[in-house]
Amino acid sequence: KLFIVESPAKSKTISKYLEGEYKVTSSVGHFRDIPKSSKDAIDIEAGFVPNYQIVPGKERVASELKSLCAKADEVILATDPDREGEAIAWHIAQICNLGNSKPQTLNSKQTGKSEIQNSKLKRIVFHEVTKPAILEALAHPRDIDDNLRKAQEARRVLDRLFGYDLSALIWKKVRYGLSAGRVQSPALRILMERERKIRAFRPKDYWVITAHTETKGKNPLVLACTEEPDKEAEAVRIVAEGKKGVWRVKDIEETNVRRAAPAPFTTSTLQQAASNRLGMAPAQTMRAAQGLYEAGHITYMRTDSTVLSATAQKEIASFVVGEYGTEYSTPRVHKTKSKSAQEAHEAVRPTHVGKKTVGGTPEQKRLYDLIWRRAIASQMADAAIARTKIIATTEAGGIPDFAAHGARTEFFGWLKADPDAKSDDVELPKVIKDEPLTLTDISSEKKQTEPPKRYTEAGLIKELEKRGIGRPSTYASIMKTLVDRAYVLRENRTLHPTELGDVVDTFLEENFADYISDSFTSEMEDDLDQIAEGKKDYVKLLKDFYGPFSKYVKEKTKTIGKLTNIGKAPANMRCPKCGSAMVIKLSRAGTFLSCERFPECDGARTMEGESFDTKKELKETGEKCPECGDSLPAGRQGKLVEREGKFGKFVGCSNYPKCKFIKKGAESEEAKRAADTGVVCPECKKGTLAERKGRFGVFYSCTNYPKCKFAIKAKPTGKLCPECSSLMMEGTKTIPERCSKKECLNHNPHKLLKK
């Protein structure tokens, strides 16, 4: 008997439960896919039939699966309980000739179930890797759900077609190597919408006025003016009137509010909470959650549902009563708000409530703690908060009211389980109406309005979900793609669009606004959901999209000119060689200023105004290019020359870009010695840290790369941090050294000064 899952870690956990009854193996994720670079990989005329190929490096996996399935009397396909898992199960059935992967018959079209052609094949699903869940699933096998599988295939084909056509156009019209995506491009547009608001923002002055008073019982009471004047004269008047006035308590407002228990985590809310509270990137969160799920510690982590099973509710209720008391227990059902809640999943929760700490890595332990606390809190009583507002003014009047706000937790409720979610109590002194107050100081402080804040990863996920763009299971990959493409920089969890991201988004908004709009992307997600439900036809959906889209791309290919200039340079930026005006151009390294008379004049400046030479003499190595050194006529034959690219120095062909040959390992020994700091790598203890250049500038990484991937962004000093014993690196002018570990207080000069 053969039991197939998609993860080696998951197969290891399940093997312990099945005690030798089954041979448990894995597909190691997706092992077949549609090629990224070949449009011929999809047969459009035949009804958008993809030509699947074995993923490079997975040939052995596919071969072993075929061999094992051929020998087995029974094959259990136990891949994940979602569209991706259904697709993997279908691919296994196809390559192993198990018969359950054949197209739908007329009888099976409504249900989406393929007819069983081979009785030894069974498909099972479970939402937690525990022995009871697996045994229950084995007792209730089903067919492969062709609707779910088709929904996954439709998404993949859509993304490929969108990317093939639009990315090819951007390569021709903007710059080679750029890309557009059906979901990544709308996400980039959202970031750029905010960025343009920030650029257009003009700050305005306002004044904050604060009065320090004492109550009758000599207790301090700090009050803030309820109005913030935008004229200094008005602020001066209020302060002057306040100084000579007699102060009293005008009114006291007390309200009792209830802070409702939060719902257990969905994929989206888990990613947001992990980002906000743990500082974890979405991809990091999903990796840690995957590990916890495969080890049997949490339920399936890709879900839109906030529902807990009846068994889980009872288990949590029993735990809450025993741990906190009966008054803290309030079992409840949190209704799922998402219209796309997929495939009857549960919320993300611990599989064993009694286990407070589990996980094989620090990230898994921190994430499990967050999941555990949220699941427990979701079944507890609301917290009761008493809020107080004291309003004060002068007896003579003539100035706005001043107010102080306080809050006190009367009953902790669910906050007992999740104290980090509690806001700090602000206790105000006891006063009565008309009680006199003694003014000890009153002052005004000039401030300026602030621009909208850039999106954090958590904020962008929330916005994508609100607009219906993508699905929670895709958010992590969206973030990763934007960063990998250098369209966005991630700094302290904040997402900063780059100049390159701006250029690509501007091009798409000017030419393909309808295809990267909220409505188009959201409606397409709804259509994919309808395929999964058997309500929409796969071929019709793709035909309705691709017919008009491909026609529009062809029209734009003819009408859009090559984007050589992306704007005019500031008037004060003149060509350093001939004095002509300059224009903004795009290079592999970003934007720069070029003489408007190019190619007659090759004067250039950085965006900051520093001039540079665009024609650096290339040093020949004395070798012919292995690819074109003999194949071209004399005078045009390629020679190997030393070049410098965005990732540092390399040896390549003199005929670049026509010939893209690059000699591997061609860095000179002299250059290697010059770049090596001699500081031993703290991670592998074998290599040393050497200077390298990446697309974001200079960094220092281990010479033992790729076996060791340790890297820091500044030159190491060789000393160890007094706070955490990590490696120290060069800092700023005011602080010569700082810790290389981001989580350490010693990493940030400002925090270090505060300490």
Task: Show which residues each predicted segment covers.
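Intrinsically disordered, low-complexity regulatory segments
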Residues: K1-N100, S119-E153, K422
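Conserved short loop/turn motifs at secondary-structure junctions
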Residues: D80-D82, R175-S179, E254-A263, A273-L278, ...
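Metal- or metallocofactor-binding catalytic centers and their adjacent structured scaffolds
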Residues: P229-A263, Q271, E435
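C-terminal or mid-to-C-terminal helical accessory/interaction module adjacent to the motor/catalytic core
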Residues: V129-V208, E254
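Intrinsic disorder/low-complexity segments
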Residues: N100-K120
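Basic, low-complexity terminal or inter-domain segments flanking catalytic cores
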Residues: K1, S167, A200, E253, ...
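Amphipathic alpha-helical transducer elements in NTP-driven molecular machines
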Residues: P8-S11, E21-V28, V55-A72, G85-W90, ...
